Amino acid sequence: EIIELTGAPEGQNRIGVLSLPSFYADMEGGDRRCAKDVKKILERMNKENVDGLVIDLRSNGGGSLEEVRLMTGFFTGNGPVVQIKDTRGNVDIKSAHNRQKLFNGPIVVLINKLSASASEILAAALQDYGRAVIVGDDSTFGKGSVQQPVDIGQYLPFFAARDRAGLLKVTTQKFYRVAGGSTQLKGVESDIQLPTATAAFELGEDILDYAMPYDQITPCTNYKKDSSITAMLPALKEASAKRVEKDRDLQIAREDIAMMKQRIKDNKLSLNKKTREQENSTLEERRKSINKERKGRFAEMAKEDATKYKIYRLTLDDVNAKELPLADPDKDNEQFMHLAEDPTAELDDSPEYPSGLDPELREGINIVQDMLKLESSGK
């Protein structure tokens, strides 16, 4: 999507949103590749004079290392992307070979605890180069290792049932950032934290009993960090914190997180029927109260959005269009998301977020706006 802010000055008024559910690649040598598709989107964004960008990596579980290597270069230009150490201690540096950046504007990367593997490589590289502000959960998943499937059958006697022996996934390598730290256990830590739906749950490598430890190796020497974001961060954090305190949906998220953490900590449920019915009734009343309040508030937000934003759809089907169509979240979801009928869907009366912009995405857009303003003022 491209979001045009109708009240903002030129040079600060067009923000792109790039949603990446995975770093996909056609393993059979086909033409569908994440980096190739993203390049088309970014080229069209440049044509549309997009000033800043939100890259949404929430719940992106990873994918092709080659695709993330290529894609990182779109934002950093030529230079190292990730270091990979094998069991013998040999370090292989994977680099991008772009002569120049494809996108030069300020970037916010949205992450959560389910952003893992290749997502962490991209987020870490953009953070180490000083190209992006990382926003979301306190950190990503923390999967900094590489597994190789091994056919157990090849080690069995000749007359054994090899075809039914199965596969064993063996850890053979470990990822390291260009700055030297591993993404293992720690993941990529956010520059600005937001209360999110995944924050209440114990997710990540660090909760596993036998997870590999975090460690560091020698940083790459042939990369240069842009210090401008470091200088901006105090102002960005302060502005974001003020908005979060006033954002009703993010406050509801905070309340939900606190309630869920307490339930997990208590680790018990009453077996008394009346007690359980009362607990369920209390939760249901809270849900209904929140939804009722949201319906009225979302209607007002939708009216405000209509005067504040123009949202243009930008998919692979639109990259060569003469003019980009205006986005219609309901219609676009019907067209592009062909889902099996969900018999329980009608039981959920939670209203949809106005303009298809959830609270974290809205705050990501706000932070990009702040970055553009600070750049413009020279601070």
Which residues does each predicted region cover?
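Generic preference for well-ordered secondary structure
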Residues: 37, 41, 52, 59, ...
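Mixed-charge, polar/low-complexity N-terminal
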Residues: 56, 82-83, 88-91, 156-158, ...
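Short, intrinsically disordered/low-complexity patches at protein termini
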Residues: 89, 106, 157-159, 193, ...
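A general structural signal for short secondary-structure boundary/capping elements
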Residues: 99-101, 157-160, 215-222
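Polar, glycine-rich mid-to-C-terminal structural blocks
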Residues: 118, 130, 135-203
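Conserved functional hotspot residues or short segments at active or partner-binding sites
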Residues: 177-378
